[in-house]
Design a protein with these regions (language model features):
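N-terminal pre-domain/capping segments
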Residues: 1-104, 326-327
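Hydrophobic faces of well-ordered beta-strands that scaffold small-molecule active sites
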Residues: 2-10, 34-38, 53-59, 117-119, ...
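Well-ordered, non-membrane alpha-helical segments in soluble/globular domains
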Residues: 17-26, 76-77, 92-105, 138-151, ...
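Short, solvent-exposed beta-strand-terminating loops
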Residues: 51-74, 122, 237-257
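Histidine-acidic metal/acid-base catalytic patches
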Residues: 2, 99, 113-115, 189-196, ...
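Active-site acidic/histidine proton-transfer and metal-coordination neighborhood
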Residues: 91-193
Length: 327
């Protein structure tokens, strides 16, 4: 099992290490990490992030994309207010912009020599993140996702493991085995499996009270996954107990009468979603039970911290929860 941490090529991540490859390597060694899972690989520079430490790549996630993909201009204008805002969000006006972006990321991942790539099959509109009255079903999102993925991978020369990561928005949630089989059977790329994000699965239950209960919930859901459990190659390990917050937001939204006017690029929306999924560490040693149950090839500490010091604190907290060194 490789123990990894999430890292991106964005300045806010790399400036913590002074854009210095040695400082990044030293940090990984200090915390017994085998490498990183890299976000935004297109901006990768080997002088900062040596190939040997990049074990996985997290492909771009467009939270709101289905109407853009389907060319639904009316719905896009309702959400974004103007086509200029749409173009800014997607960096173009044609679905081909998404296809080409993913192809560039995959080509970079292949050049780096990454062992796996993570892809979210999910969609949510901003208003739906407040009231949970979703515009599309899991099946509709997955149908479009399969179409997108097949176009992205058409003709690409790579054999990196493609791992579908569960979300709590419509799409692949890891709650429906048939959806998982559909992805496996209809995505025309042979080397594929799943990435279990623990917090995302926790977010599908708004009544979890503590980490022990959450771990049991995750294990029960994975048991229902049956034989597909063996295709869970990695775990994004982080904790989310935000059910009370979500329930309060749903109640508040249902009681409001004014028209919803936040757009997908709003800072308020970003902070709202972060309150739902805050990427905090596990603190209870039941986390070890989960790792022993899944037996992943990749264990990624997917944590979000405001400083290097806080990140170290989070890693050490989760190490204690996992009793990692005895596994």
């Amino acid at each position: 099992m490789l123990k990894l941490m999430n890292l991106s090529t964005y300045s806010y991540d790399l400036e913590r290490f002074d854009f210095d490859s040695q400082k990044i390597t030293d940090f990984l060694e200090k915390h017994y990490m085998n490498g990183v899972e890299l976000l935004n690989p297109i901006m990768w520079e080997e002088k900062i992030l040596p190939k040997k430490i990049v074990k996985g790549v997290h492909l771009k996630y467009y939270p709101t994309w289905l109407d853009f993909w389907n060319g639904n201009r009316r719905s896009l204008l309702k959400q974004f207010k103007s086509m200029d805002a749409v173009e800014k969000y997607y960096e173009g006006i044609s679905r081909d912009i998404m296809i080409q972006h993913y192809r560039k990321e995959i080509e970079t991942a292949t050049k780096i020599g990454a062992e796996y790539m993570v892809f979210h099959v999910a969609h949510v509109e901003v208003e739906d993140t407040y009231d949970y009255k979703f515009a599309y079903s899991d099946a509709e999102v997955v149908e479009a996702g399969i179409d997108l993925i097949n176009q992205v991978f058409s003709g690409i020369d790579t054999n990196i493991k493609l791992l579908f990561e569960n979300m709590w928005w419509p799409g692949f949630t890891m709650l429906d085995k048939n959806i998982a089989f559909k992805l496996l059977n209809r995505v025309e790329y042979p080397n594929k499996g799943f990435m279990l994000d623990t917090a995302h699965l926790m977010n599908t239950n708004l009544y979890l009270k503590d980490e022990k209960e959450a771990v049991e919930y995750i294990i029960n859901r994975v048991e229902e996954f049956g034989e597909l459990k063996n295709l869970i190659k990695g775990i994004h390990l982080n904790c989310s107990l935000s059910g009370e917050y979500v329930r309060s937001q749903i109640k508040k939204k249902n009681e409001e009468s004014e028209e919803f006017d936040l757009n997908p690029m709003s800072e308020e929306v970003f902070m709202h979603v972060f309150k739902i999924d805050s990427h905090k560490p596990f603190t209870d040693n039941s986390a070890r039970k989960l790792i022993e149950f899944i037996k992943p090839e990749y264990l990624i500490y997917e944590l979000v911290a405001s400083s290097t010091g806080e990140l170290e604190e989070y890693i050490e907290t989760q190490d204690r929860a996992c009793n990692f060194y005895d596994i």
